Amino acid sequence: MSKSFAYRHIWCFWRFNTPLLWFPQPLKYWPAFQQSHTFNSMSVFKNDNAIANQTTVNESDVKRNVEKINDIYECSNNTKSPCFPNSDSRIPLVNWKTSTNPTLQVRAYMLDLLLPFFTLDLLPFLNKVCECCNHMLLDNPKIKQDLPFAFCYLFSSYFSYKSSRQYTCSSEEISKVFRHLNRLGGSEYVLHLFAQIPKALCKELTDVRTLNHPLRSIFTFCFKNISNPPNLLKLLTKLYPRSDRANEVLYTQYLGFLTKRGDYQIAIYMFDEMYRTHHWSSFTACRLMIESLVRQNKFEEAISLYKKIIAKRPKIARDKKILNLLLYISTVSNRSPDAFKLALQSISNANQIPSFDVFSRLMSALVKYNMTEMILPLVKQYDHKFRNLYSPNIFLSIVQALVFCGDMVNIQRWYNMSRVNSELSRIKHLLNCFLNSSTVSLDVSMVLELLRDLKKKKIKVDERTLVICITIFSRRKDLFAMEKIHQYFSDQGIKTSNQAYAALLDAYIEAEDTEKIELYLGKIRRLGITEDVSINRMLMRLALDRLDWDLLEQCTKVAERKDPEGQDYLSTITMLYHVRQHELNLALRIFSGIQKPNVVHYSIAATVLGNLNQLDQLLLLEKRMESEGKAPTALSLVAFVSSYCKQGAEGLDEAKRYMSKNFQPDKRALLFNPRTANDMTYPPSLFSSLIKEYTSLGDIKEAKQVLSTYLEYFSKNITSKPDIPFAIASMRLYCSLHDTVLSRQFWDLILQVAQQNFITTDIAAVVDDKNIPSPSGVIPAYKSALNVAAETYFSFLASVNSFQELDQEWSRLEKLGFEYDDSLQNKRIIWLLYDDRLDAAIKRVYNIFLSSKRIEELIPDASSQNSIISFFLSPDSPLYFSTLKALRDKLDMAVEDDFVRISQGILVPTVKYLQTIRRDNEILFNLLAKV
């Protein structure tokens, strides 16, 4: 068969059996060739690369380029080709074959060889093309640089032909074509070919709604290997104006490539090109740009861009991923109420919560912005939309939101629901959430319930869970429960990590348990982990507690080598060391040497300046903190307000100014929530010093004003739980006003907080199968925690002659397990004398101070009664001389009256009563005789 006959056969087959095959004009829209292509015989191409290197592309450049290329392939309309009808004015195949340009020769040869196979499906056709390329390379390796252009044109023709016959193929099949073209070194031609693919061939390829495009990895490879992708993309929009969707896909994919690589400036430039020039604003592109701004912490710019986009395309406001980004901005940035308002507005307009992720993020945002009243209504809305489709993540987000609010009732309710409806293996993550809220961790009931469920369901826990539990119980200073839970997890095979050893050491340092501190120091040394970062920080704390400068220097050397991120902590410990040594100027010198002091450093410096009575320096410190952009926290507020209050009337005015400036309603949620201050005692403690100072100055009006400010805050913010210092200050205020009712209310509040936070945990009932009960009562570290509060309230009761109530409340505290110090015991004796109960006072002196057990504790080497009497008359005596003097005066009065009233109102002659004292307690009798 001759070649001419073959051409006629092919032409007849296409002409009479199918519509005319109209190849796309090969050069009218074809761009400049790659820089790697050089055509020695065609000098007209030498300047074509200038177009690809230009920063801007205009219409005249494109036209001039097209004219150059068309001139090369100029042919006569009278030329007859066996491949095309006479009416076709396109370039004949014969002219391509006879061209002196090697690229055109390769293309002509491939078309000549592969035209008969256009009827094949894509993959068989690709196999034929690959065979052809391999044979051509074997025959002439020099044509390798000419193959990509020919390959691209061949498939452009093939796709057009197939599309005209309603042929479709999958993205996976097309991706194989592009991968082969990439292997040939034609990355630029991949983008050209993609821009020419008919939309009907594979609609999936022109979907701009998703960044996870089927050809994403191929595009990424191309963008890496193209010298100037932005310019090429702009050129494609000029050369292929009808391929608008394909070009938008390329722009969007390039945006994703840039933002992933961190080239944000180019990304902004490309998005501006899309948004302003081409008026493209797909969900994906908008999300990419907002994400890129968020990664750079440019939250305000991200919000501004969002506003511009929704002004043009309001539907974008309903996109769940963009909505989630807005909520992310509102929760991670210092303060982005605009982002939160936009997100809430979008949810409100849509009248639905679009996704699980958005709901979870929304819960966190509501907590941050102190909008706790919206949590439960939104939960109901979520329930209505998703019809009880509560996933473990959703339960976690709901319970976490309630935990951060301190709403114990609803925490219990939703936790119980989560146990029934979700996987408890996920619920164990709530332990970390409990750790971040002292409202829950100090109450500890939820912690015990969660541990009980973990044990019952035999859910595996890890080292992190052990560290959290140790921290929770050590925060309560409940060492028995902490040791019990440590043993329980150890029995389960959970290894005690370095962080766990650090937490244990921290707990014993806090409890001042010297024996246990030495025990664990020995374990840490044997394990060789003294230079672990977390252990080293606890050793710093031990050095601070013991005021051991040598140990602190050793820890400093370790920190400089292994803990570069812990320099702030080191500076904090060093400042506190000098403060405890009363070297206040040295502490300030350390502060001045810190390059970027944090809020803790500022708080310590403020406390030092307050103790030095340097009001001017304190004001300058406040201004410096503001100028450096350090937002005040609960800790810094307490430090500054307390320090100002120590500076007299002028300082009190500054405290009031500082308070009113920083305690604005819109700032409170940021300042006082479990995320920013683990210790929830900060909000009320902030008011304690002000109330105390105003009360001591007799300015009751201002004291009441401060108290009402807090009560207003407390009524609207369930994250704030009154602490004992605040209750004492408030109680002192009403005691000074002789308001028995309100004083009693604050006293009851003190006992309520104490019963929640200071009572031992029945941990044995949770983890011990032997049913050995835990020691009940007050945690040893808190046995004397209520002495100051009790002294204030009992003194008030004595001043208003409410001795019966005083007796009741005294017994009430003793039954709870609290202990009174010697100072309060001396006052108790005086109060009994005020109530004309001499016999009860003498019995208390004997039982508390002069029992044989107490004398043995106080004077282990007492050799005689005279030495005991000498001790109790010395300044070191726990029984004050003033107390003995009051007893002696009362006895002298009884001698004058000739009788003493004992229990049940019985009157006893004074002489007989003194004889009884001498017989039963000779030491007391002789002691009183010496006064």
UniProtKB/Swiss-Prot annotation:
The keyword Protein biosynthesis appears for this protein: yes
Extent of the PPR repeats: 247-277, 282-316, 429-461, 462-496, 497-531, 598-632, 683-713
Gene Ontology molecular-function annotations: mRNA 5'-UTR binding; mRNA binding; translation activator activity; translation regulator activity
Keywords, alphabetical: Activator, Mitochondrion, Protein biosynthesis, Repeat, RNA-binding, Transit peptide, Translation regulation
Main location as per UniProt: mitochondrion
GO cellular component: cytoplasm; extrinsic component of matrix side of mitochondrial inner membrane; mitochondrion
Transit peptide among keywords: yes
FT transit peptide: 1-16
Knockout or disruption consequences: Impairs growth on galactose. Decreases the association of cox1, but not cob1, mRNA with the mitochondrial small ribosomal subunit.
Pfam families, per database record: PPR
Function: RNA-binding translation activation factor that as part of the MRH5C complex specifically recruits cox1 mRNA to the mitochondrial ribosome for translation initiation.
PANTHER family linked: PENTATRICOPEPTIDE REPEAT-CONTAINING PROTEIN 4, MITOCHONDRIAL-RELATED, RESPIRATORY COMPLEX I CHAPERONE (CIA84), PUTATIVE (AFU_ORTHOLOGUE AFUA_2G06020)-RELATED
UniProt-recorded name of the protein: Mitochondrial cox1 translation regulator ppr4
Organism listed in the record: Schizosaccharomyces pombe (strain 972 / ATCC 24843) (Fission yeast)
